[in-house]
Amino acid sequence: MWPFPSRSLFPPPTQAWLQTVSSDPEAQGWGAWNETKEILGPEGGEGKEEKEEEEDAEEDQDGDAGFLLSLLEQENLAECPLPDQELEAIKMKVCAMEQAEGTPRPPGVQQQAEEEEGTAAGQLLSPETVGCPLSGTPEEKVEADHRSVYVGNVDYGGSAEELEAHFSRCGEVHRVTILCDKFSGHPKGYAYIEFATKGSVQAAVELDQSLFRGRVIKVLPKRTNFPGISSTDRGGLRGHPGSRGAPFPHSGLQGRPRLRPQGQNRARGKFSPWFSPY
């Protein structure tokens, strides 16, 4: 047990102390003093002013925090629009596309748009083209090939106008085409000259080995490419024994086993000269 009684350590409050505490708020603690400070005598005014200043400071801080919060909310709304707004924008775009597809264009406008698309596609394949466009039918293309020449070893900096001026002495030039790479757009180093008449082709061939921009050019009649027929000589003529994929002609020796003479190349262990691995 505790050797000292509780009353000796914590004596009960006296009547005088209770009266003093009830009359003096400072004796009741800081909480009671803050509540009753403003009703005191001359010192109460100063406490009230301090309290008002603290309240004003807190209001200013709250106002600043609210202003910053409103700015952040506006930025978030600007950066991330509402899902409903995005959905409405997508719907409007889809409706506009459907109306554009469903509304028929006038014949003149549609024909002009198709011509512009065809011109753009032709410029991608041959951007350096001067003269009339290429005819559409196969017969007209073959006839145009007979009036054209191939020009090789053309300087990369040469233009279609310069080639037209170089071959203008041979006759009227109908069209000049400089072939370019479809990926890089750089010239390939050769061109085609189409004349108005076939007689100009022979005169243009005479300009073979002539100088164009300091380079010796090669001029040949243009070959006509037929679909399904190759004009190149790859692997020899078809049907020839040396051509690729052509069978050997039948002979009396075909189908018979190839015999090796006895006693030859057995000691060395090499293949017989009669053996063909392929």
From Swiss-Prot:
Compositionally biased spans, kind Basic and acidic residues: 35-50
InterPro entries reported for this sequence: Nucleotide-bd_a/b_plait_sf, RBD_domain_sf, RRM_dom
Sequence segments annotated as region (Disordered): 21-66, 101-128, 227-278
Annotated S-S bridges: none
GO cellular component: cytoplasm; nucleus
Keyword RNA-binding among UniProt keywords: yes
Gene coding for it: PABPN1L
Compositional bias (Acidic residues): 51-63
Intracellular or extracellular location(s): Cytoplasm
Pfam families per the UniProt record, alphabetical: RRM_1
UniProt note on tissues of expression: Expressed in various adult tissues.
Any one biological process term the GO annotation gives: maternal-to-zygotic transition of gene expression
GO-annotated molecular function: poly(A) binding
The protein, known as: Embryonic polyadenylate-binding protein 2
Domain RRM: 147-224
Organism encoding this protein: Homo sapiens (Human)
Keyword Disulfide bond among record annotations: no
PROSITE patterns, per database record: RRM
UniProt-listed SUPFAM superfamilies: RNA-binding domain, RBD
Keyword tags: Cytoplasm, RNA-binding
Residues of the signal peptide: none
Stored CDD domains: RRM_II_PABPN1L
Function noted in UniProt: Binds the poly(A) tail of mRNA.
